[in-house]
Amino acid sequence: MDSIQIVGGEKLKGTIPISGAKNAALPLMIAALLTEETLTLENIPHLADVELLIRILNNHGVGYAVDGQEFDDDGVNSRTIHFTAQKIATTRAPYELVKKMRASFWVIGPLLARCFEAYVSLPGGCAIGTRPVDFILEGLKAFGAHIAIENGYVHAKAPKGLKGAHYHFPKVTVGGTHVLLMAATMAKGTTVLENAACEPEVTNLIRTLNAMGAQITGEGTTTLTIEGVKKLQGTRIRVIADRIEAGTYAMAVAMAGGDVFLKNANPNHLTTVLKVLQKTGLEIQIEPHGIHVKRNPRNTTIMPVDIKTGPYPAFPTDLQAQFMALMTRAEGVAHITETIFENRFMHVQELNRLGAEIKLDGQTATVYGKEKLQGAPVMATDLRASVSLVIAALAAKGETIVNRVYHLDRGFERLEEKLARCGAKIQRLTA
């Protein structure tokens, strides 16, 4: 099993190209099930979750072709994938595939919309708490679907097709919004989704579906209205830049020090995060094709900042672990409150192994900043926790080995290469 070795103490300097967003790419890929025509997606990242979803879609009969240079001289991904679901081979999504990634459950929406039936295993993925599958099933019931749980599978049927409905999400859910949006595109009549997620990744999906012939209004708001259509067509669209990856590398610079240009990062998707990082002392400059981040070598103090995660545009839960790593070196005490997932502090124990002092009280972590961290062997517990350990290790004295980095490969494209290009002493160790 691979691990990552980091020797801390090196400043970062250079350019880091920001990849296409995994959280945007996955629902766009799943949307290919909605049409018999070809859906072409540009800027698809090379990630384990993407490759797994390709296998899942292929199981349903979706053909695909890859073109474009893998990486240019600057390390920028130019991969384009053409997906064609001319015929749906099966409406069954098996446990052996779905158990590996929760987002694979989202196929239930398009399969039900197009084939009037879906038989999908209950999902897997990172073990970071309850995810709102129930909201999805309740929404599909509102659309007229019959739902049964059988031997660990959800069997959904709508023999006469789905019907538009008014549905209020009990809690904001990005995945639930994705699924019900896709399901509603071909439902008969009008659908209104209230308390919907308005993340940039949701907007990317809405624009894709509209380009395919859907009629969705309310983009960027919490109320979405969908007028059902009979058929969707193919289109070509670009996956947005990964705001979580951009925020992660900005925090790495804040932690290790240095001067880095985050190429292709979209500052409009990071407004709250950038404001928080500026409060910590990071210098940020918005440029036409990205974000320039710098920690002034004459002022190396990291200021403590309290944050609370929340639905967009609040501070994203997917950057909570990375920010906690940064706060371990702050000059003072920071409080981090997690409101999205109830079990997303599994990285605390491992950060403490590096010399951090973090105490938990329910959904709030109190981080007591330390002058120094010490390298140690640590173990990744989930995707975002794994990269928080890398960030901490960049500033720790000595060597850190991060084990179980298969979590990292699910969501970060060539992380060790991107950091090494900027001067970090980091390498992958293959067992």
UniProtKB/Swiss-Prot annotation:
Entry's Gene Ontology molecular function annotations: UDP-N-acetylglucosamine 1-carboxyvinyltransferase activity
Catalytic EC class: transferase
Location of 2-(S-cysteinyl)pyruvic acid O-phosphothioketal modifications: C126
The EC number(s) this enzyme carries: 2.5.1.7
Annotated pathway: Cell wall biogenesis; peptidoglycan biosynthesis
Reactions performed catalytically: phosphoenolpyruvate + UDP-N-acetyl-alpha-D-glucosamine = UDP-N-acetyl-3-O-(1-carboxyvinyl)-alpha-D-glucosamine + phosphate
Coarse class of the protein's main subcellular location: cytoplasm
Active site per database record: C126
Biological process according to GO: cell division; cell wall organization; peptidoglycan biosynthetic process; regulation of cell shape; UDP-N-acetylgalactosamine biosynthetic process
HAMAP family found in the cross-reference section: MurA
Family to which this protein belongs: Belongs to the EPSP synthase family. MurA subfamily.
UniProt xrefs under PANTHER family: UDP-N-ACETYLGLUCOSAMINE 1-CARBOXYVINYLTRANSFERASE (PTHR43783:SF1)
Function noted in UniProt: Cell wall formation. Adds enolpyruvyl to UDP-N-acetylglucosamine.
NCBIfam families the record matches: murA, PRK09369.1
Protein name: UDP-N-acetylglucosamine 1-carboxyvinyltransferase
Organism from which the protein derives: Bartonella tribocorum (strain CIP 105476 / IBS 506)
Lineage: Bacteria, Pseudomonadati, Pseudomonadota, Alphaproteobacteria, Hyphomicrobiales
